[in-house]
Amino acid sequence: MNNWIFAILMLGVAIVLSIIATFFKQIFTIFKRRKKKEPVWVTVTNAEYLDRDFWKGKEQKDKKEHD
């Protein structure tokens, strides 16, 4: 009878540990989702400003070619 009680107790401990591990896993996935930033969409209206804002070296190369 003592072995049955021990087996049921160990089964309960395993279930509780599994529930706790799943809970922490869900918490970590929620925190990972919050850190991701929204991607910046490039539309036709702001695409003409890309070489001025992001590719500053392009303007300098164009000036050197004209000199």
Curated annotation (Swiss-Prot):
Topological category with respect to the lipid bilayer: Single-pass membrane protein
Keyword annotations of the record: Membrane, Plasmid, Transmembrane, Transmembrane helix
UniProt superkingdom: Bacteria
Compartments in which it is found: Membrane
GO CC, alphabetical: membrane
Transmembrane segments: 4-24
Protein name: Uncharacterized protein pXO2-12/BXB0011/GBAA_pXO2_0011
Organism this protein belongs to: Bacillus anthracis
